[in-house]
Each structure stands twice: as C-alpha cells, then as structure tokens.
Design a protein with these regions (language model features):
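Short, well-structured alpha-helical segments
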Residues: 30, 34-38
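Enriched for short, Lys/Arg-rich terminal
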Residues: 1-12, 31, 67, 72-97
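Surface-exposed, Lys/Arg-rich phosphate-binding patches that contact polyanionic backbones
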Residues: 16-28
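Residue-level recognition of oxygen-bearing side chains
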Residues: 16, 57, 90
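Active-site micro-motifs of SAM-dependent methyltransferase domains
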Residues: 19, 43, 87-90
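A short, surface-exposed loop/turn module that caps and links secondary-structure elements
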Residues: 38-63
C-alpha cells in the first residue's frame, strides 16, 4: 500500500516578512526560518503552528527559537502568506495592514 505525498502549499512572503529576513533577524535565525518555511510550513501549516488571538486573530503562528512567524493560510489556493517574523516579545506590538 502506497500513500500519496502531501501536496505542498505555496509560500509567499509579504513585505514585512521579507524585510525581517533581510534586515532584522540574525543570520542564523533567518536561515532557520527559510528552512522551516520551505519544509514543514509548506507541507503541514496547520500542524506546525497554532491559531493566534487578539490583534492577530485569523492568523497562525509558529515559533523558531524565540522568534514567531505569523502567517495566514489560504486553503482554496493552497497558499501560505508569511506576514511577519519577529521576536515573540515584539511581534504583537506592531500595527498590521
């Protein structure tokens, strides 16, 4: 009996997430985030994160060390929109678009 591999989600980085990777995150954290997004997040976004509440309601979040990756899942088009990445103590204090 063979099982079909899970269909991957497309990962799209929004401007704030791209800026975080290029400018704010330490190099090792940025590399870990990119690897996580390309592997686990693209395959099982519901399992690797959790739903967020408050100002981030409707989004999911996953931790890489002390950094939170905030993302939204579009099931219809199988796209994960990575909205922002920052230290978990800072991510909740920035305004969202």
């Amino acid at each position: 009996m063979t099982t079909e591999p899970a269909q991957r989600y497309e990962i799209r980085f929004q401007p704030a997430a791209r800026r975080a990777i290029a400018q704010r995150l330490p190099e090792a954290v940025a590399a870990a985030v990119l690897e996580f997004c390309d592997a686990a997040l693209a395959v099982k976004p519901h399992q690797v994160g959790k739903p967020l509440f408050g100002p981030l309601a409707g989004c999911n979040g996953a931790l890489r060390g002390t950094y939170r990756i905030v993302y939204r899942i579009d099931e219809k088009s199988r796209v994960v929109h990575v909205l922002d990445i920052d230290h978990r103590s800072e991510i909740y204090h920035r305004p969202r678009q």
